Amino acid sequence: MPMPPDDSALSLLPDHPLAAHNTFGIAARARFAARITQAAQFEALHRDPRLANLPQLVLGGGSNIVFTRDFDGVVLLDEIAGRRVVREDDDAWYVEAGGGENWHAFVAWTLEHGMPGLENLALIPGTVGAAPIQNIGAYGLEMKAYFDSLVAVELATGRRERFDAARCAFGYRDSFFKREGRGRFAIVAVTFRLPKQWMPRLGYADVTRELDARGITPEAATPRDVFDAVVAIRRAKLPDPLVLGNAGSFFKNPVIDAAQFDALRARAPEVVSYPQPDGQVKLAAGWLIDRCGWKGRALGAAAVHDRQALVLVNRGGATGADVLALARAIQADVRAQFGVELEAEPVCL
């Protein structure tokens, strides 16, 4: 799909409601909002006198944010579209997508065009532009494994810059854009390197169980089989944000050192854990939360999902303060019972 022509004109929408722009469905408002469909619009922002001294927030699918109050600035709705193969060599395809493209639709598109690799990341909510910020991951795969580069615009100067993987400094659900670069850049396009030699990632039992239920052995599984299995698992475990507001997994799986893990295992031998290559141990945050008795419980209109303890939901009319109060109560209980700190994935504003 070709990228549409440049048009840097910016139309501001005053007192704009944000409930439809965050997957929690939290009712908040922005002083202004603007729909961004071209990189040139991001590049022109610093010259717009209407935006002088106003805070700016780039928003994609709104699946990684909790509004605790109205936003007294301009929300920039990233709707930059486009998907294309920018080049190809003997080993891989290099595929670019606009920052505003829906992530799941992009993953499906790569498979439909015979370019597998991203199927373990199917049905993750959000946009392509948000994927590198969080270094999204699921079922044994992180986005960084197939990341090539991205183009971002520095909002204060309008300068367009290219970032390779080293400059992005990816970590576990982390990147430069969540730390030093937070709030400074708008990601307008991301390029992925998809190897022509497909490497299935079937290390998670959930995926192999779902394949087995479909009569498919790991050896016989195709990229489409893995995609379908991941979609089925996520739909069974995670609520649809259009039905029950949520931001997917609310907490990161904590990573602790070996000594701390030994002490924890002495108290809770059945703790669900995943050894890491560096000797540390990743814990299943959902298991910790469940063991503290939070699954299915509520505080006001915010609740823990009854099938997946990692997911906090809006039962209807929840405010960002409600969600934050629930998250803090869970963190306090996990800290008290297991001595482990849980870190929230979404940004709370």
Curated annotation (Swiss-Prot):
InterPro entries: FAD-bd_PCMH (IPR016166), FAD-bd_PCMH-like_sf (IPR036318), FAD-bd_PCMH_sub1 (IPR016167), FAD-bd_PCMH_sub2 (IPR016169), MurB (IPR003170), MurB_C (IPR011601), MurB_C_sf (IPR036635), Oxid_FAD_bind_N (IPR006094). PROSITE patterns: FAD_PCMH (PS51387). One of its GO terms (cellular component) is cytosol. It holds the Pfam family FAD_binding_4. Its main location: cytoplasm. Pathway: Cell wall biogenesis; peptidoglycan biosynthesis. Its EC number is 1.3.1.98. It is found in: Cytoplasm. It comes from the Bacteria. GO terms for biological process: cell division; cell wall organization; peptidoglycan biosynthetic process; regulation of cell shape. GO terms for molecular function: FAD binding; UDP-N-acetylmuramate dehydrogenase activity. HAMAP family: MurB. NCBIfam families: murB, PRK00046.1, PRK13903.1. This is UDP-N-acetylenolpyruvoylglucosamine reductase. It comes from Burkholderia orbicola (strain MC0-3). The lineage of its organism: Bacteria, Pseudomonadati, Pseudomonadota, Betaproteobacteria, Burkholderiales.
